[in-house]
């Protein structure tokens, strides 16, 4: 006898953790709540998060927590859209619907093929592996300067002194942001992404002002690239033509290239670097292991990315009715893919809660999966590597000097500040 098919209303009644609301940002105020998702992974297949007082848009959403389920959905871009679906006016990759002017259908991570694929091809020459490799010397020097300055202090906020400083330098150099503008842009982005004073779907005065200032700067910057283009990623977006007769990018799409490159380039790498050092603080044996065997660097980078999962989830929207297992996901319903949960799934990983820099089987999802995987992955890895190389050469360990101050967000697993004392080698 076949199983009965269950729709979202019925599945909402079966939500296994009635006291847990994944849209309550307090749940994420001390980092990603791994125990909650360990409990959710015990339940096979699709779960439906019921509507609560906090869920945006007055509706619930599907939740996928297991590695293999998430991989399959992330690769099915025809059924699960990054832009939107059904009769929605907005969409995007966050739980809350974003209006069209905020990105869905216009920003690369909220686009669908064929335009998404054509945009990736257009801007990819600005961030090829060869081009990233050519940045190694200058990034190594910049990392060295940041580390040396930090080591002169008795204690330091590792996030602002090192973890944020190199990504800011790297992405600004890649795009061509003037040196004097960099820290102001960083402050605007922080204001937009920090949910310390609001809930999902809400805005605050600081976030509104940050967004307005950031986008106004972006408009001006894009126009300057239109007048004086180079070979950088924004210039390619402004001057280039999409393949297959899709024409030029619209002005909004051009602006969104600037926006997503700056935000993703700063936020994701900063969080991975800071979270990686926190992992080494909690697992000092792994720092010693990496000091003794530099050949573990690549696997260490992958383990840091798996462990930190800087972007915990992405959302898709169903473009048609589809049955997965015994669940009916209907056209227009929200579907969330929790990368951070997949990265601790014991049906894929052996001992997923062990921080093991020599881990061999580690096809982590920190950069996403499928056609929407992160274009800047190699740059992020390079930034992480040059910082670690300097620290490994001069530091035998780290000690926390106070509590870790986490960003209150379910979309970014980030550390706002982290006071650290270095155990210097000499």
Each PLM stretch: what is its role?
Residues 1-426:
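Cytochrome P450
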């Amino acid at each position: 006898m076949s199983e009965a098919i269950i729709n979202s209303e019925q599945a909402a009644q079966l939500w296994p953790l009635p006291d847990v609301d994944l849209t309550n940002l307090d749940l994420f105020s001390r980092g990603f709540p791994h125990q909650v998702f360990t409990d959710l992974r015990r339940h096979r297949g699709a779960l439906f998060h019921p509507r609560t007082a906090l869920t945006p848009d007055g509706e619930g959403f599907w939740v996928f927590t297991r590695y293999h389920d998430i991989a399959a959905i992330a690769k099915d871009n025809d059924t699960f859209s990054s832009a939107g679906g059904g009769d929605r006016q907005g969409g995007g990759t966050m739980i809350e619907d974003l209006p069209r002017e905020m990105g869905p259908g216009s920003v690369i991570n909220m686009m669908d093929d064929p335009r998404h694929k054509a945009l990736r091809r257009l801007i990819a020459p600005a961030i090829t592996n060869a081009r990233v490799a050519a940045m190694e010397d200058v990034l190594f020097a910049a990392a060295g300067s940041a580390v040396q300055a930090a080591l002169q202090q008795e204690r330091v906020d590792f996030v602002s002194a090192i973890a944020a400083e190199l990504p800011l330098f790297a992405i600004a150099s890649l795009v061509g942001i003037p040196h004097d503008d960099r820290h102001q842009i960083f402050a605007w982005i922080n204001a937009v992404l920090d949910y310390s004073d609001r809930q999902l779907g809400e805005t605050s005065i600081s976030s509104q002002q940050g967004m307005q200032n950031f986008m106004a700067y972006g408009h001006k910057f894009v126009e300057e690239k239109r007048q004086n283009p180079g070979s950088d990623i924004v210039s390619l977006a402004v001057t280039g033509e999409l393949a297959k007769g899709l024409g030029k990018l619209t002005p909004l799409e051009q602006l969104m290239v600037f926006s997503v490159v700056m935000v993703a380039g700063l936020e994701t790498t900063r969080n991975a670097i800071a979270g990686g050092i926190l992992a080494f603080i909690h697992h000092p044996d792994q720092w010693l292991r990496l000091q003794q065997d530099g050949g573990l660097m690549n696997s260490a980078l992958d383990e840091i990315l798996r462990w930190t999962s800087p972007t915990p989830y992405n959302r898709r929207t169903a473009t048609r009715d589809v049955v997965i297992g015994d669940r009916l996901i209907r056209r227009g319903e929200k579907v969330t893919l929790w990368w951070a949960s997949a990265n601790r799934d014991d049906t894929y990983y052996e001992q997923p809660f062990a921080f093991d820099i020599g881990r061999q089987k580690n096809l982590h999802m920190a950069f996403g999966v499928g056609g929407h995987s992160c274009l800047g992955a190699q740059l992020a890895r390079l930034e992480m590597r040059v910082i670690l190389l300097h620290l490994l050469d001069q530091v035998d360990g780290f000690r926390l000097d106070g509590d870790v101050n986490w960003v209150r967000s379910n979309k970014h697993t980030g550390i706002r500040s982290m006071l650290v004392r270095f155990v210097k080698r000499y």
